[in-house]
């Protein structure tokens, strides 16, 4: 990593295992991997790291609670814990070494297929805008910002991160009629959907949550 990051001023760190898995399986990619990125940034005098964090760093809060960037961590599993760790790692490297960091707490960056995603959706266009703002903003210091579109039902607030200049354009409400026309029995039966972390919050530690997620990896109709 040190060789790959020579003579760069900014690193976008989006690499990770993106599921709930046993801790030892998570350790290399999500914990040590993040340390390696920031240590390489320090050794190579890199000015900033843009990090793909996750809603799962605060996934155990009830969905009725509005979350802000300054909301304390409440991880919903080992995956969420790895995001908490890296946000704290980023804070330490900023305080000790002056490396700026923008931690993007990405919510649901996939097609809207559930009632929960009406609150948490981040469109691809808004994701691109968010990353570009994290890159182009002149001075970020250490910042946390939620990756979420301008959804009518959202209770993720970026009131503490206005300096990033992220102004999402899309709104999941355009999918609401279709979602409520579907059978929601299975979704509503999952206690995790009462929490910001969704199925990750109700899945046992170390057990995959992706099987419970109604994610459709298709751009048809977009």
Per-segment meaning from a language model:
Residues 1-29:
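NAD(P)H-binding glycine-rich loop region in Rossmannoid oxidoreductase-like domains
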Residues 10, 25-36, 44, 73, ...:
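Glycine-rich NAD(P)-binding loop of the Rossmann-fold in SDR/ketoreductase-type enzymes
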Residues 11-15, 49-55, 104-106:
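SDR active-site strand-loop-helix element
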Residues 28, 62-101:
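Catalytic helix-loop patch of NAD(P)-dependent Rossmann-fold dehydrogenases
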Residues 36-76:
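Conserved Rossmann-fold NAD(P)-dependent oxidoreductase catalytic core, especially the SDR/UDP-sugar
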Residues 95, 105-111, 121-143, 150:
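Alpha-helical substrate-binding/gating segment
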Residues 116, 140-149, 157-159:
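A recurrent short beta-strand within the Rossmann-like NAD(P)-dependent oxidoreductase core
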Residues 150-167, 179-217:
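Conserved C-terminal active-site "lid" loop/helix of NAD(P)H-dependent oxidoreductases
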């Amino acid at each position: 990593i040190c060789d790959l990051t020579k003579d760069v001023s900014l690193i976008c760190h989006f690499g990770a295992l993106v599921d709930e898995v046993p801790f030892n399986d998570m350790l290399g990619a999500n914990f040590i991997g993040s340390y390696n990125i920031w240590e390489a940034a320090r050794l190579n005098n890199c000015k900033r790291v843009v990090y793909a964090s996750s809603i799962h760093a605060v996934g155990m809060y009830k969905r009725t609670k509005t979350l802000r960037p300054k909301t304390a961590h409440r991880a919903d599993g080992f995956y969420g814990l790895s995001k908490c760790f890296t946000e704290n790692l980023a804070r330490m490297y900023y305080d000790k070494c002056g490396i700026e960091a923008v931690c993007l707490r990405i919510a649901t960056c996939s097609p809207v297929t559930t009632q929960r995603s009406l609150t948490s959706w981040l469109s691809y266009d808004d994701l691109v805008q968010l990353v570009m703002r994290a890159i182009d903003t002149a001075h970020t210091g250490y910042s946390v910002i939620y990756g979420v579109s301008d959804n009518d039902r959202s209770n993720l607030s970026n009131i503490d991160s206005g300096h990033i200049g992220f102004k999402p354009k899309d709104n999941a409400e355009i999918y609401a009629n279709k979602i409520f026309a579907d059978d929601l029995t299975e979704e509503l039966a999952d206690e995790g959907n009462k929490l910001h972390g969704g199925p990750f919050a109700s899945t046992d530690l170390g057990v995959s949550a992706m099987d419970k997620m109604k994610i459709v990896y298709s751009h048809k109709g977009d």
